Design a protein with these regions (language model features):
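Substrate-engagement module of ASCE P-loop NTPases
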Residues: 200-205, 242-250, 439-445, 476-492
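Conserved P-loop NTPase catalytic core
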Residues: 241-276, 507-528, 539-542
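Phosphate-binding and hydrolysis-coupling loops of NTP-dependent motor/remodeling domains
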Residues: 2-13, 27, 54, 59, ...
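Basic- and hydrophobic-enriched, low-structure N-terminal and domain-boundary segments
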Residues: 2-184, 197, 203-213, 217, ...
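Short secondary-structure boundary/capping segments
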Residues: 230-244, 274-277, 471-475, 507-511, ...
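Glycine-rich phosphate-binding loop of nucleotide-binding enzymes
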Residues: 155-258, 474, 503, 548, ...
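P-loop NTPase motor domains
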Residues: 206-212, 218-219, 223-227, 252-479, ...
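Conserved ATP-driven motor cores of ASCE-family P-loop NTPases powering translocation/secretion/packaging/pilus
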Residues: 478-565
């Protein structure tokens, strides 16, 4: 962050900012039309303006003395375009003559500004010749509406090293909820920025006393990026540390992290199936009893399909029949009694046995399961059930389950719970996400209270809530996007292409963020919050730079965020002297 010439600093909303006076940079251009919403600035020869600079012009308004104390209107705005040309040049070759001193041409620079605030709200344009200044300190906070934010979430730094804030009331559900992040995989740093927003939430004072009970569920859908949130990053430089300090944030890993990984299918013991991260990871699975009584079958058929498909009817009928008939087995918390095709109670000891029983009852034309379904539909259902058993079966244990309570994902045990699914088949990924999110939604719905807040971080939304087709997984996520705000469930979703995600999920996000975009994707209507110039910038953004749009501003702001203080891969993770489970009681 740049320092002022006298080296003085001031505190603005708890963040250190340079204590600089506003700098005159030019005047309102007279050769271009200005309006209350946008205007042009002629840049002085000894000054410059760049994209995202915040500027202010004060203009006299005749006859408005009764509306303004000083008779002046203050219009603030943000630069979104800068241009330059030779004045009085008629031919392309004139530039060479000017360089040789033959033609006395002068370089003119001017900038386009989008208005962000008018005080008082008097909708008149600035006058040509009015002085324009680049603002700092409180004038900048007013221009960007930061002064009206009661609780400010640190979003990162602007191009000139000034802090950028998000109004927390548009994140936590009071006035709006949900965050959506788009960008090219591997370049847009979507997951990293989602992690930074969580870090800012939990390691600043923005949540106040609510921080102790606020939780986050983070799904690690690819690679091992999120499996080291509790480990310091050895690659963090002194410059990165100074950026954290400038934002008023510590440069340390997440303080309270629980890591869950699927049970290893190749081991008879309930050990986690992970790669580089082995210590401090808890294996998760569900029991046959959980599967039957909590209605999990639908999430094994959660690939996008036609909403009118009769397979969905068969799934619903089988699921409800199993729930109705299931009886607990004394002394066996992981298994159940289910009726076979003869109507006799059978002790179901494994997921494989449960699938076989379902198939036997369907082949025996069990009316409770069949209804009026065609035989071809039943055959399709059984083929998919076989596939689900092969791809997800190791996640459902029966009488071979040891201490099942210890392996049930407990999102309340730590502030941040990372649920690893990156090694699973796509069907198994959808199953885990669907089951966990559905259970969370039902628990919050039963509590009837929005507190404590729960944040869900999920990448690759296009897989779990695609625009076309219907699935139980998509239905749950859509429900969260529409009703989660009132229940205190906040979705921080990310995807490469917003055009392939269910439209209502994207549009319900109050905070829209774009990293680097594919040129064709940037032209899609889902990015209507980006101006034409912003779309062009989006295809050039570097890792660590995002375009942030929030309701209080009419245009997106470019935001940069520090390199993660937590490790994102095993090569960055600081070694631990003693392996200690994150699920152990704090010392």
């Amino acid at each position: 962050m740049p320092k002022s010439s006298d080296g003085a600093w001031s505190e603005v909303f708890g963040v250190r900012v340079p204590d600089e006076r506003s700098v005159p940079v030019g005047a309102i251009l007279g050769t271009e039309t200005s309006s209350p919403l946008e205007w042009w600035v002629a840049v002085a020869q000894d000054q410059y303006l760049q994209l995202d600079d915040v500027v202010l012009v004060r203009t006299a308004v005749a006859g408005a003395e009764a509306l303004t104390k000083s008779g002046e209107l203050a219009i603030s705005g943000v630069v979104d375009m800068v241009q330059a040309k030779h004045e009085a040049s008629n031919y392309p070759s004139d530039v060479f003559l000017a360089n040789e001193g033959v033609l006395p041409l002068q370089v003119a620079r001017w900038a386009h500004v989008v208005s962000t605030r008018l005080e008082p709200e008097l909708w008149v344009p600035p006058s040509p010749g009015d002085a324009v200044v680049r603002v700092r300190g409180l004038d900048r906070e007013k221009a960007l509406h930061f002064d009206g934010m009661e609780e400010r979430l640190i979003a990162g730094l602007s191009r000139d090293g000034q802090p950028i804030f998000i109004d927390l009331s548009f994140v936590d559900g009071r006035r709006g909820a949900h965050v959506n992040i788009s960008g090219i995989s591997g370049v847009a740093t979507k997951t990293t920025y989602a992690g930074f927003l969580l870090y800012s939430l939990f390691h600043s004072n923005v949540l106040g006393i609510r921080a102790a009970n606020t939780k986050a569920l983070v799904f690690n859908v690819k690679g091992e990026d999120l499996l080291f949130l509790d480990r310091p990053n050895t690659k963090l430089s002194d410059e990165d540390r100074s950026r954290y300090e400038a934002l008023g944030l510590p440069h340390e890993p997440f303080r309270s992290v629980g890591i869950w990984a699927p049970v290893n299918p190749r081991s008879p013991e309930a050990i986690p199936d992970t790669g580089s991260r082995q210590e401090g990871v808890q294996a998760y699975f569900w029991t046959v009893r959980d599967f039957v009584k909590e209605g999990m079958l639908r999430f094994m058929f959660s690939e996008a399909g036609d909403e009118r498909s009769q397979i969905a009817d068969v799934v619903a009928r089988v699921e409800s029949t199993l729930q109705r008939e299931a009886k607990d087995v004394p002394g066996s918390p992981a298994t159940v009694y289910i009726q076979d095709q003869l109507g006799e109670d059978v002790h179901v000891k494994s997921f494989r046995q449960l699938c076989q029983m379902i198939e036997q009852r369907l082949e025996a034309n069990d009316d409770q399961l069949l209804g009026h379904t065609a035989r071809g539909t039943i055959s399709a259902f059984m083929r998919r059930l076989d596939g689900a058993r092969a791809q997800c079966g190791h996640l459902i244990k029966g009488d071979d389950a040891s201490n099942p309570g210890e392996h049930r994902i407990d999102w309340t045990s730590r502030q941040v719970s990372v649920i690893d699914i990156h090694n699973l088949h796509d069907r198994a990924k959808r199953f885990v996400v669907g089951v966990v999110v559905k259970r969370l939604f039902e628990e919050k719905e039963a509590s009837g209270s929005a507190e404590p807040l729960v944040f869900i971080v999920l990448d690759e939304l296009n897989k779990y809530a695609p625009r076309d087709g219907w699935s139980p997984m998509k239905e749950v996520l859509l429900d969260i996007s529409e009703r989660g705000r009132s229940l205190g469930i906040i979705l921080i979703g990310a995807q490469q292409t917003a055009s392939e995600v269910e439209r209502r999920i994207v549009s319900n996000a109050a905070i829209r963020i774009a990293g680097r975009l594919d040129p064709a994707e940037a032209l899609r209507p889902e990015y209507g919050f980006l101006s034409d110039n912003a779309r062009k910038r989006a295809v050039l953004l570097k890792p660590g730079t995002m375009l942030l749009q929030q309701p209080q501003l009419p245009m997106p702001l470019e935001v940069t965020f520090p390199f993660p203080a937590w490790a994102t891969r095993v090569s960055e993770a600081a070694p631990t002297t003693t392996a200690r489970s994150p699920f152990a009681e704090p010392e």
